[in-house]
């Protein structure tokens, strides 16, 4: 500000000195990032109870598929829809356990 009295004209002049115009319409191009989408996998297994074939469609990383493969070989078994309904209709409502 100039002088001891503040006027709107003085403030406006000082703002013009501080604020510089920004050109928002520019020719700059931004590179688009490519995102790696996990590959879809088809998994075939058999029902633990009736041994009917099961088919699952999964989307995962190769490491995730490898982990699922290990689980299916070691300690996880799958049930078909019919066997699953039968198993759960004959038990008390209980989740995640025998």
From Swiss-Prot:
Protein's cellular compartments: Host cytoplasm; Host nucleus
Keywords: Activator, DNA-binding, Early protein, G1/S host cell cycle checkpoint dysregulation by virus, Host cytoplasm, Host nucleus, Host-virus interaction, Inhibition of host innate immune response by virus, Inhibition of host interferon signaling pathway by virus, Interferon antiviral system evasion, Metal-binding, Modulation of host cell cycle by virus, Oncogene, Transcription, Transcription regulation, Viral immunoevasion, Zinc, Zinc-finger
Domain notes: The E7 terminal domain is an intrinsically disordered domain, whose flexibility and conformational transitions confer target adaptability to the oncoprotein. It allows adaptation to a variety of protein targets and exposes the PEST degradation sequence that regulates its turnover in the cell.
Segments for region (E7 terminal domain): 1-37
Zinc finger (unnamed): 47-83
GO terms for MF: DNA binding; DNA-binding transcription factor activity; protein domain specific binding; zinc ion binding
Record's GO cellular component terms: host cell cytoplasm; host cell nucleus
Recorded superkingdom: Viruses
SUPFAM superfamilies, per database record: E7 C-terminal domain-like
UniProt KW Lipid biosynthesis keyword: no
Disulfide links within the chain: none
Naturally occurring in which organism (per UniProt): Bovine papillomavirus type 3
Name of this protein: Protein E7
Motif Nuclear export signal, chain ranges: 65-73
PTM per Swiss-Prot/TrEMBL: Highly phosphorylated.
Assembly with partners or alone: Homodimer. Homooligomer. Interacts with host RB1; this interaction induces dissociation of RB1-E2F1 complex thereby disrupting RB1 activity. Interacts with host EP300; this interaction represses EP300 transcriptional activity. Interacts with protein E2; this interaction inhibits E7 oncogenic activity. Interacts with host TMEM173/STING; this interaction impairs the ability of TMEM173/STING to sense cytosolic DNA and promote the production of type I interferon (IFN-alpha and IFN-beta).
InterPro entries for this protein: Papilloma_E7 (IPR000148)
Function: Plays a role in viral genome replication by driving entry of quiescent cells into the cell cycle. Stimulation of progression from G1 to S phase allows the virus to efficiently use the cellular DNA replicating machinery to achieve viral genome replication. E7 protein has both transforming and trans-activating activities. Induces the disassembly of the E2F1 transcription factor from RB1, with subsequent transcriptional activation of E2F1-regulated S-phase genes. Interferes with host histone deacetylation mediated by HDAC1 and HDAC2, leading to transcription activation.
Example of a GO biological process term: symbiont-mediated suppression of host type I interferon-mediated signaling pathway
Keyword Metal-binding appears in the UniProt entry: yes
Organism lineage: Viruses, Monodnaviria, Shotokuvirae, Cossaviricota, Papovaviricetes
Locus of motif LXCXE motif: 24-28
Family: Belongs to the papillomaviridae E7 protein family.
């Amino acid at each position: 500000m100039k002088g001891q009295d503040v006027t709107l004209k003085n403030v406006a002049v000082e703002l013009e000195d501080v604020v510089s115009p920004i050109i928002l319409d520019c020719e700059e191009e931004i590179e688009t990032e490519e995102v790696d989408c996990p590959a879809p996998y088809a998994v075939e297994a058999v029902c633990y109870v009736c041994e009917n074939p099961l088919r699952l469609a999964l989307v995962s990383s190769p490491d995730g598929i490898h982990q699922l493969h290990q689980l299916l070989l070691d300690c996880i078994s799958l049930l078909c829809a019919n066997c699953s309904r039968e198993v759960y209709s004959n038990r008390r409502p209980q989740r995640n356990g025998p």
